[in-house]
Amino acid sequence: MAVSFELTEDQRELQGWVHQFAKDVVRPAAAEYDEREDFPWPVLQEAAKIGLYSLDFFATQWFDESGLGIPLTMEELFWGDAGIGLAIVGTTLAAASVTANGTEEQVGRWVPAMFGTVTEPTVAAFCSSEPDAGSDVGAMRTRAVYDEATDEWVLDGTKAWATNGGIADIHVVTAVVDPELRTRGQASFVVPPGTKGLSQGQKFKKHGIRASHTAEVVLDQVRVPGRCLLGGKDKLDARLAKAREGTRAGGNASMATFERTRPAVAAQAIGIARAAYEVALDYAKTREQFGKPIIENQGIAFMLADMATSIEASRLLVWRAAWMARQGKRFEKAEGSMSKLFAGETAVKVTERAMQILGGNGFTREYPVERMARDAKIYTIFEGTSEIQRLVIARSVSGAPIR
């Protein structure tokens, strides 16, 4: 079977289209919204106007046969700016959860509503992490109790680090329905707009990705109709019964979403790394010290060589994992985690080296690499820390119950 790494004409057009938007709209607004730590609604509206923020675009790229539509989009958008990029794509994590775990009726009802309209775009939030349950999803405390008399689920708890939390129209919340089963006793629920009892808690002031809204979501006796349980109650009851019998019945809803989205998140990190590398490369070619461009110094040139190599290697890991996921192939060696681990750590290393190459200029806000370095760090933390990725990979390659 022939192997080709050439992008199709359609893929190159997609790449160029998103890149142009990132160059013309995202980059000019990046420093302002980083400084303000505010959600970039005007940029989201521009994305909606051209169809970049829409259900049609999400569906087209999500179901792209090659699996590369989402990674290509992510890399170019986050090349523009990571904070604004997350503001634009944050809704897709909630949409991905409903698409992966919901019934056909639920997907048709809730996913379109997440994006709003061209003139009035809205956002959605996926709420999984908690103050005491980040990587350890088994420590989740948010509870969902079924009220049979009213056919409603009652949700109580606090979610942390929720992208778009509190400002979203629709929240997708993961909760424990059977505490004894730990991760296998969890389910996800859609909380519709205007539901009583849901409120925004603390809005976090962050080191990076400041244009992305990140906050706590407080759930106080939140009642949602039975139809808001993703997958439906019959499916949940069957899964819980198998879990109680000790029979494997698939992973929990949060982890299923994370596994499917890790290559996309890794592609975001590549966009940040590539942007910083390009700034450093251009700077090294024009900055002169001791009578010659600093790129002619081996110490600088070798740093750039390592940066370029790591970016290219990261992209290949991402493309492979994204293709495997789209083809329905199992991640036998935790390929999704490999892509997230390597790309996330590459972003941190590349942005730090870019700052070093720019010297004192790199440490100022007159140049964008200090912002890129702040943004990059989150990619070794969220959607599974680097340590968790290594744990997943180690378990996969060893077959041992490593802790």
Name what the model sees in each region.
Residues V3-S4, T73, L93, E105, ...:
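Glycine-rich phosphate/cofactor-binding loops in nucleotide/flavin-utilizing enzymes
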Residues K49-P121, N164-I170, A325-G328, R374:
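Internal helix-loop-helix
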Residues E120-S129:
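A short, Trp-centered hydrophobic/proline-enriched beta-strand micro-motif
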Residues V3-L14, S199-E312, Y379, R395-P401:
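Glycine-rich beta->alpha junctions and the first turn(s) of the following alpha-helix
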